[in-house]
Amino acid sequence: MRRLVLTTFASVDGVMQSPGAPGEDRSGGFEMGGWLVPYVDASTVAFAVEWIQQAGGILLGRRSYEMLASYWPHVTDPDDVLARHLNRLPKYVVSTTLTDPAWRPATVIAGDLATEIKRLKADGDGELQVHGSRRLARSLIGQGLVDEYRLWVFPVLLGAGERLFGDGLPPTGLRMVGSRTSESGVVVHTYQPAGPLTFGSFQADADGRA
């Protein structure tokens, strides 16, 4: 069974809205789009290329699919490894309104999310990677369908904007399985779910020692 890996670009204060371009997502009056672009360098590109080569398919919400579809099909340089993989990989788009996805190969998922994701995880090789797709990502987290988090944390504070980990998600322990830092200061943390969250307290012993 393949793993579902959630890949997210986020600021230090957890904002994931509109990372790649000013007009990517202006919902809620957000006007700071494109905040990750100054930090893209050879090392971040190398990270992205390495991980996209591990993908067997890409799972996206409709808006993220349409945003990516407006750019990547037009990158036809045969030496661009990232574009080559993104364009050839199967895309699975969760949507109840999209009927004819133009960026192929693509399949629209309109049925029960948990059922469809379990089927996709049981069928095929390589990671099933989620990129962006804020609403979809929250649904996957809430239903316990994420096997690994790949969180790209950029050295910026935005102070406003949509966050991935909002109120209402189930408390969950995480285990760090990897961490990398780019030359530009981007830190990529990789976590896997570690079961229910546990709690404790600090108490001094009879001799006053912690």
Could you say what each language-model-derived stretch is?
Residues M1-L145, P155-A210:
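Portal/gating segments that form or line small-molecule/metal binding sites
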Residues E148:
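A short helix-turn-beta junction within AAA+ P-loop NTPase domains corresponding to the substrate/partner-engaging
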